[in-house]
Amino acid sequence: MSEYSIFTSESVSEGHPDKIADQISDAVLDAIIAEDKHARVACETLVKTGVAIVAGEVTTSAWVDLEQLVRDVIVDIGYNSSEVGFDGATCGIINIIGKQSVDIAQGVDRTKPEDQGAGDQGLMFGYASNETDVLMPAPIRFSHALVERQAEARKNGLLPWLRPDAKSQVTCRYENGQVVGIDAVVLSTQHNPDVKQSDLREAVMELIIKHSLPAELLHKDTQYHINPTGQFVIGGPVGDCGLTGRKIIVDTYGGMARHGGGAFSGKDPSKVDRSAAYAGRYVAKNIVAAGLADRCEIQVSYAIGVAQPTSISLNTFGTGKLGDDKIIALVREHFDLRPYAITRMLDLLHPMYRATAAYGHFGRTPYEMTVGADTFTAFTWEKTDKADALRAAAGL
């Protein structure tokens, strides 16, 4: 039986201030890694009324027109006029990026690439569950679907009075580990001042909520809270300061799994906060896809400058078809979780990261991208290409 009878997760749109910051940080990473695959990047962004501040540490041979890059991201999200409270074309851009510490570099860089040390100490978690088709928890999956649809309806002109900032929240009811109903839906969306609240609520219900959520899970007692405070005209960086790395639960499993605390956006793959969390998802998803367990959470930890993980632990919450200790042995046999090996296994040295910075890093569909002369697959950590080998090794 599921550990939870009711569980709630939330998501935010690409126009949420914290997500603007995440997307800018990852756009900077992409621009650098497109020219210098082995660059070291740690980029943080702050956005507030009329200004974007970009800071961090970078070691690279690449040159990036950072000001234009930041403006392009902001405008692309939808902040293109003072009428919506933020204008990427005219806002101030402050660049305070410096160089990476040589003390860190000496702990990471090695003559033999496979001996590359972790960029920092830390612990990372990966998770998967068979409750949805993408092996993600349903509450975060559905929450992402709502704000993705909000952005789609805004950008394609279906609901042209929508503005970029939005938040969603979904409460799911479980029986025996599977979702049997949605008990509550919250969707708050920024909008133009001239739209009537009654029209907004009807349109959001019919064209966003009902379009995004499985009809069979909505029932007569489902609670709907659409812009529950009423008017939501002032939003984005005018309403709230946005910072990189403040939506780490939205980025991962919606609280259904534990989190080591490290954010992803703006960090190159040498930072295990990001790459090892991606590897953890890859491992957990393949374990569930192989049928070794219905749910799986894995923890990996590292010491700065050391290649081998300091620990690997795993929990299948009583759903494993064999013991957790035996599954850990299979993980060690089939997955090399040293930092360089993760980068190679998941092919992470490509400019794929801005695409991860909104609507979740996990539960996405791998797809081919081309940037300049570089063609690669994004979201490789969502592949289940190890499932057959794991199943065979487990004797299932």
Curated annotation (Swiss-Prot):
- List localization entries: Cytoplasm
Q: Name one GO molecular function term.
A: methionine adenosyltransferase activity
InterPro entries per record = ADOMET_SYNTHASE_CS, S-AdoMet_synt_C, S-AdoMet_synt_central, S-AdoMet_synt_N, S-AdoMet_synthetase, S-AdoMet_synthetase_sfam
Could you say which residues bind ATP here?
H16, D165, A166, K167, D240, R246, K247, A263, K267
EC numbers listed for it are 2.5.1.6
Q: Which UniProt keywords apply?
A: ATP-binding, Cytoplasm, Magnesium, Metal-binding, Nucleotide-binding, One-carbon metabolism, Potassium, Transferase
Task: Summarize where K(+) binds, as residue positions.
Answer: E44
Give, as in the UniProt entry, the pathway in which the protein acts.
Answer: Amino-acid biosynthesis; S-adenosyl-L-methionine biosynthesis; S-adenosyl-L-methionine from L-methionine: step 1/1
- Binding-site list for L-methionine: E57, Q100, D240, K271
What chemistry does it catalyse, as a reaction equation?
Answer: L-methionine + ATP + H2O = S-adenosyl-L-methionine + phosphate + diphosphate
* Principal EC category: transferase
Name the needed cofactors. Mg(2+); K(+)
Which residue ranges does the record annotate as region Flexible loop?
100-110
Output one GO BP term. S-adenosylmethionine biosynthetic process
Q: What is the free-text note on the cofactor? A: Binds 2 divalent ions per subunit. Binds 1 potassium ion per subunit.
Could you tell me which PROSITE patterns the record lists for this protein? ADOMET_SYNTHASE_1, ADOMET_SYNTHASE_2
Q: Name one GO cellular component term.
A: cytoplasm
Q: Where does Mg(2+) bind?
A: D18
Biological function:
Catalyzes the formation of S-adenosylmethionine (AdoMet) from methionine and ATP. The overall synthetic reaction is composed of two sequential steps, AdoMet formation and the subsequent tripolyphosphate hydrolysis which occurs prior to release of AdoMet from the enzyme.
- Record-stated family: Belongs to the AdoMet synthase family.
The family database entries (NCBIfam families) matched by this protein are listed as: metK (TIGR01034)
Q: How does this protein assemble? A: Homotetramer; dimer of dimers.
Protein name (database record) = S-adenosylmethionine synthase
Gene name, per UniProt, is metK
